[in-house]
Amino acid sequence: MIFKDYDFLQNYDLKNFEEKVKIYKELLSKFNRIHNLTHLKNIDENIFDSIKILDFYDFSKAKNIADIGSGAGFPAVFLAFLLQGNFHLFEPNPKKAAFLRTLKIECELSNLHIYKEKVQEYQNIFKADIITSRALMDVKPLLEICKNLKDENTVFILWKGSEIYQELENIKDYEIFENNLRKYCILK
């Protein structure tokens, strides 16, 4: 995938991003052979899906971004490749957390922090400016398990499918941006 062709990425260091993406793909391939981290067929498509939110939302003021259920790193790892904020990834699966820790070392990502625990068990030392999650669970339970990380200024950014409209019943302050079948939901 040629990232320089996308206008919303013009203000980022794409050479560094593409180098880190290459490391990511090599490491994922290596780990996937042993640990079966993901069944994704088109990694580039999922990387693009992870960073497309930058076309809709400005992360520049966010100091602490928490990602819930980080799995193989979508979307947080790719945002961390591009952005300066501190990314706190919560992934209780030991194999996936080990992959993320190895990736942090290999890509020299000092802004990436990996927590091998469920977010609801985390004794917080920070409040997140932004909380991200990609298709982990319905909105209301997600809001509940993140209560230790949020305050009145926290914004949730969720990567969802068409079911998002039913999940937002009785929730008032949100925006949805669409890219093909993906719905990017921003809850304020």
Curated annotation (Swiss-Prot):
Alphabetized SUPFAM superfamilies for the sequence: S-adenosyl-L-methionine-dependent methyltransferases
Binding site for S-adenosyl-L-methionine: G69, F74, V119, Q120, R134
E.C. number(s) listed in UniProt: 2.1.1.170
Catalytic reaction annotation: guanosine(527) in 16S rRNA + S-adenosyl-L-methionine = N(7)-methylguanosine(527) in 16S rRNA + S-adenosyl-L-homocysteine
Membrane-spanning residues: none
Domain of life: Bacteria
UniProt GO molecular function: rRNA (guanine-N7-)-methyltransferase activity
InterPro entries in the record: rRNA_ssu_MeTfrase_G, SAM-dependent_MTases_sf
Cellular localization per UniProt: Cytoplasm
Keyword S-adenosyl-L-methionine appears in the UniProt entry: yes
Pfam families for this protein: GidB
Enzyme class: transferase
Keyword annotations of the record: Cytoplasm, Methyltransferase, rRNA processing, S-adenosyl-L-methionine, Transferase
Subcellular location, principal: cytoplasm
CC annotations in GO: cytosol
Function: Specifically methylates the N7 position of guanine in position 527 of 16S rRNA.
NCBIfam families: rsmG_gidB
Family affiliation: Belongs to the methyltransferase superfamily. RNA methyltransferase RsmG family.
Name this polypeptide is given: Ribosomal RNA small subunit methyltransferase G
